[in-house]
Amino acid sequence: MRAPAISLSVAALALAAACSSNPSPQSSPNPRQDGRTRGGADTMPGNRVIENSRPDVSARAGVLVVANQEGASATVLDAATMKTIATVPVGVGPHEVAVSHDGRWAVVTNYGDRTTQGNTLSVIDLAAAAPAVTRTIDLGEYHRPHGVAFVGIGDKLAVTSETSQRLVIVDFASGRIDTALATNGRGSHMVASRRDGRRAWTANISDGTVTEYDLDTRRTGRTYPAAPMDEGLAVSPGGVQVWVGSNSAHTVTVLDAAKGTPIDTLTGFGMPYRIGISRSGTLAIVNDPVKNRIWMYEVGSRKQLAEIDLAKVDGVKATTGGAPGEAGAGPEGVTFDPIANVAYVTLHGTNQVVAVDLQQRKVIGFGSVGAGPDGVAFSPYVR
């Protein structure tokens, strides 16, 4: 058992000083006094990490935040028990979620629906006794926010704006727009970043391309062809590989990030709708709502490790609907708890989120959420 430790970098001190000049209860990156994050939380510069002293760090803990696309809400769950902590009203059509590196804050993109174009982000305080939206970030002219990631040293957000064809960089503490980078592609939907937050990529659905960004210099880099109707997107932690799912070709294209060229193509999917790569960079999950399956791959070799057929999993509810073309549960969003070696997957068709043991390669837990769950994010914050 490791003793509790605090790591506070020079960059964090600079960030704290900047925040103190414009004080706001929402701008502090630190957990509440009695809160803590577990060992293994992201220790990128600028983040205070308080290690939990629990002897068994492999046990599930922390919280999950699920965007309920059809419920205008986000469900906050205890990751250990899969019980609901709070159902938080957000904007119309919430699609994706990102959690700050210290685990305290969740940011939900309010995309809108068929009649309303959203342009806001909801910020949820996960450390509050009753998690709730503490502020709303207005993106102004940048409508249809979808993909979102904490980047830089954790002090910035990268958000796709589909209608504007921009990757919008937002200062998290102030909520002000830092810059908006051209995506050079239509339908820029998902965004994924390298673990150090210095480079990012977007999948541009309508053009079947991927665009890269240098977040240090705030410049748009290359745009290169990937696959038609590419939506699912994941980047290995070191930024070596970019995995791109094609909804129409039913394939996953693996790109060499340095060259922007394909190194492999995985086949046999109905719709590789969402892709996630573990923090270790060794395992990839591909969620396929058409074939109702969760696929697992070794990243280095691209070898298939497992295929979980949700129709055969006890505990998955009877289908309540789902998007057109979906069969059964409809697995969509994915996130990882790197300490417990567990992934969490939303089931759009059954209004559930499931825990998947990455060693046993099977579903080990279930939680009920709101209507039409889509994006999901894990926080190591221990309540």
Residue ranges and their predicted role:
Residues 19-383:
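Predominantly soluble domains enriched in secretory-pathway, periplasmic, or organellar proteins
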Residues 1-17:
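Sec-dependent bacterial lipoprotein signal peptides
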